[in-house]
Amino acid sequence: MEACGVTTANTPTLSETKLYTSHEALLLPYEEALTRVDSLSGDWYDCSAHMLWIGERTRGIDDAHVHFLSGVKNPIGCKIGPNATAEDVIKLAAKLNPQNENGRLNIIIRMGADKIENYLPNILKDVKSEGLNILWSIDPMHGNTVKASNGYKTREFDNVMKEVKSFFDIHH
């Protein structure tokens, strides 16, 4: 940054801003290469990001991605689509957060505006009854993808907002 004339002396917010990174832990050889043991705690951390997440297609309870993330101490996210069940979420929580730590597991809903109200309420009710410490969040872009006439993937803003609104309505 100094080459651009930006330093902590003339831009103090550079040292004041907390920046956290997250990405999908899709390529396991990449993640493994960046995994280290913390010298103080002896715990394993994936140093490629602060929080790692797995997607709908890599969240199988016996999949390599779930196994890998169960072995690191980073906060973890897991995307859940309309085909998921409460039992799926409960099993994932047991494997990814066996100590039921606050802040460890983030379930990321990506069901789509037309499906969230049919599926999330029952999942939420059953999972909450287990007393699991889960952060619930939403990725309203993923479940609302459509193909435009030119073949590009896009989203209708009204559908994105509808899913967000439904997500909060269901939680309250």
Q: Positions of the model-derived regions?
A:
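Active-site-facing alpha/beta catalytic cores
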Residues: 1-112, 155, 163-164
